[in-house]
Design a protein with these regions (language model features):
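Composition-driven recognition of glycine/serine/threonine/acidic- and proline-rich low-complexity segments
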Residues: 1-196
């Protein structure tokens, strides 16, 4: 499958859009070259490849839409932020961004067998590995304990509990640490896969 850059948009073969944003676009996923040509896509700051040519990191300024031939794997980003995207196995890896004045954090611990999409508030979307993503609203003064298996996203304060220091390369582990358990303190909204 080939991609072309046309007027700031990169589209896949057959005319279906792969990327669209208000700045020069670039090829996504395994289509990414190992070395980007000078003068082309100069805004592309860094290229992360923990999964060997499957992950990219882009600095966005504006709106963005992504999809593939069979199903969308990234939908609507309205605000500027740093987003990591890859094939349909991984939708979104965003350590932090601003969403309507609230802080939204998304930590996908695993991207194996990712087959469907869960859309969050404000146009954000993350991958649900097997359609098991749960949404919990935690009121002020309440606490939710989660032992995550794959995807964790939340608004509000950072969680407490046993939370190992996570680096970018660690976000894409085949499986999360066995001892990982997070406590979310309200008011907040939490999306997660696992037991809570």
């Amino acid at each position: 499958m080939e991609a072309q850059i046309e007027n700031g948009f990169a589209c896949v073969e057959g005319g279906e859009w792969l990327f669209g944003m208000r700045q020069p676009a670039a090829v996504c996923g395994s289509l990414a070259p190992k070395r980007l040509p000078r003068g082309e896509c100069g805004w592309w700051r860094r290229l992360f490849q923990p999964d060997r040519r499957r992950l990219q990191c882009a600095d966005l300024d504006g709106r963005m839409w992504c999809g593939d031939r069979t199903r969308p794997f990234l939908t609507r980003i309205d605000l500027a932020g740093r987003v990591a995207v890859a094939t349909e196995k991984l939708l979104l890896a965003q350590p932090s961004s601003r969403r309507l004045g609230a802080l939204l954090r998304v930590v996908p611990f695993s991207y194996r067998n990712a087959v469907c999409t869960t859309v969050l508030e404000g146009g954000w979307a993350v991958v649900s590995t097997q359609g098991r993503t749960q949404r919990a609203v935690v009121a002020d003064g309440e606490t939710l304990g989660v032992k995550p298996e794959a995807v964790v996203a939340w608004t509000g304060r950072p969680p407490t509990g046993h939370c190992p220091r996570i680096r970018l390369r660690d976000l894409f582990l085949p499986r999360p640490p066995k001892s990982l358990r997070l406590n979310f303190h309200g008011p907040c909204v939490v999306w997660f896969e696992g037991s809570g």
